[in-house]
Amino acid sequence: MISKEKIARINELAQKAKSNTITDEEKAEQQKLRQEYLKGFRSSMKNTLKSVKVIDPEGNDVTPEKLKREQQKNNLH
């Protein structure tokens, strides 16, 4: 997970970009930080989805087969 300081820096750079006072160096830093943030977010989202079980209104397990295989591989369900 990305630190609070890095998130604050991302937001600071976003404000500078909105006011058109951002330098090329800061743009590169902003891109690097955004990529780091997105990588962590995607990883977290994948882990969350791996623990999901989908049940229809009749109580049947309708979890997609691909997800079931991934869960079995990781011994989650």
Swiss-Prot record:
Location (main, coarse): cytoplasm
**Keywords of the record:** Cytoplasm
Task: Return the Pfam families for the record.
Answer: DUF896 (PF05979)
The annotated region (Disordered) lies at 55-77
Question: Is Cytoplasm there in the keyword field?
Answer: yes
The keyword Cytoplasm appears for this protein: yes
Q: Where is the composition biased (Basic and acidic residues)?
A: 63-77
Q: Which InterPro entries match?
A: DUF896 (IPR009242)
Q: Which GO terms describe its cellular component?
A: cytoplasm
Where, subcellularly, is it found? Answer: Cytoplasm
Q: Which PANTHER family match?
A: UPF0291 PROTEIN CBO2609/CLC_2481, UPF0291 PROTEIN YNZC
Q: Which family is this protein grouped under?
A: Belongs to the UPF0291 family.
Q: What is this protein called?
A: UPF0291 protein RBAM_017680
